[in-house]
């Protein structure tokens, strides 16, 4: 007697084979959809941070610098256009820790959109952190033409590849929003910074209303330089307009009555004050001090530029700032160039306590 079992005709075998192929196809297409979503083709996550692709290969920092300059300038165009229209659509995002209004305008939003999507389209596999919310429903594809400007090629002759997963981009689409609403245009900047493994390696600070752009890459090149001299004994100290009096009291005790305090808006503007900037609207200072909480997108670009030029930006206790993790720092800020930075840190032991 023949063993019991199921016999399939050739047609049945073919049907089972096709069903198997169908199952495999759906499994594989689902896998691909997941991969594509990681590469930014399936929409942006909520908030100001973009997802990072898994195993994203490498990116060229020289190309990133070229796109960062373009992004800062494109964002600056939006900032200038909105300000000159005199229709800012100003609103408050809430209060800062010091109790001031945290303002936002159409200039912030439109600049953020241009800057974020230009960088995201060019480098879909890197983490991008930005001050303003990224609206996934308002997605825009802005294509970079892959041309590196001659001034960058002149300073940085060769590509510099790094793993995409090691990169974090910090965008400030409009620094000094308070001053922007007051029409104090000289303080306003747009900024882009690239950090690798938390260390700032390239920065761009663009002034939309004078159309000046400073950029630098650590261990590579820059289009800006330090000034020829600085006054370390009785320095001019640039500080935020909101707490100039607080810093002045301690600075006079530390450096003497000849010390000059320069109140100013915008972290980008304050860093440029330490450098040799060919802009008649730019004030000059020897030190930049900040004594309260500050966000990393405000300072990363300036930190990278100072570092590339041999300068320093640390907390008030002298600690290096890591551009990973949280989006702010608690320990205040001290920035200098061509000075004994650690000696300055030791001179200012009480400033951080004064800021809280």
From Swiss-Prot:
Keywords: Acetylation, Glycoprotein, Golgi apparatus, Hydrolase, Magnesium, Membrane, Metal-binding, Signal-anchor, Transmembrane, Transmembrane helix. One of its GO terms (cellular component) is trans-Golgi network membrane. Glycans are attached at residue 257. Residues 1-12 are cytoplasmic. Its cofactor is Mg(2+). SUPFAM superfamilies: Carbohydrate phosphatase (SSF56655). The keyword Glycoprotein applies. Belongs to the inositol monophosphatase superfamily. This is Golgi-resident adenosine 3',5'-bisphosphate 3'-phosphatase. The gene is Bpnt2.
């Amino acid at each position: 007697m023949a063993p019991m079992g199921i016999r399939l005709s050739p047609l049945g075998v073919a049907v089972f084979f096709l069903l198997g192929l169908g199952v495999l196809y759906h499994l594989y297409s689902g896998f691909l959809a997941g991969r594509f979503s990681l590469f930014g083709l399936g929409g942006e996550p909520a908030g100001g941070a973009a997802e990072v692709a898994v195993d994203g290969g490498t990116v060229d920092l020289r190309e990133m610098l070229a796109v960062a300059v373009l992004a800062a300038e494109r964002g600056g165009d939006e900032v200038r256009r909105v300000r000159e229209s005199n229709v800012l659509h100003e609103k408050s995002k809430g209060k800062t820790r010091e109790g001031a209004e945290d303002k936002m305008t159409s200039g912030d939003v439109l600049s953020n959109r241009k800057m974020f999507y230009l960088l995201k389209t060019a480098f879909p596999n890197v983490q991008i952190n930005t001050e303003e919310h990224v609206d996934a429903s308002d997605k825009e594809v802005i294509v970079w033409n892959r041309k590196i400007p001659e001034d960058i090629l002149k300073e940085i002759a060769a590509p510099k590849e790094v793993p995409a997963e090691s990169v974090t981009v910090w965008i400030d689409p409009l620094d000094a929003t308070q001053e922007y609403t007051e029409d104090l245009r000289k303080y306003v900047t747009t900024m882009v910074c690239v950090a690798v493994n938390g260390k700032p390696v390239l920065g761009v600070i663009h002034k939309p209303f004078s159309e000046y752009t400073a950029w630098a890459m650590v261990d590579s090149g820059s289009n800006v330089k330090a000034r020829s001299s600085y006054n370390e004994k009785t320095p001019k100290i640039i500080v935020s307009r909101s707490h100039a009096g607080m810093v002045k009291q301690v600075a006079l005790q530390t450096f003497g009555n000849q010390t000059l305090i320069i109140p100013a808006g915008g972290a980008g503007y304050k860093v440029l004050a330490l450098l040799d900037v060919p802009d008649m609207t730019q004030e000059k200072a020897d030190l930049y001090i900040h004594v309260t909480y500050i966000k990393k997108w405000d300072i990363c670009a300036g930190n990278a530029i100072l570092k590339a030029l041999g300068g320093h930006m640390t907390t008030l206790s002298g600690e290096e700032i890591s551009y990973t993790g949280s989006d702010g720092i608690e320990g205040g800020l001290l920035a200098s160039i061509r000075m004994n930075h650690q000696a300055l840190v030791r001179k200012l032991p009480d400033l951080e306590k004064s800021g809280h």
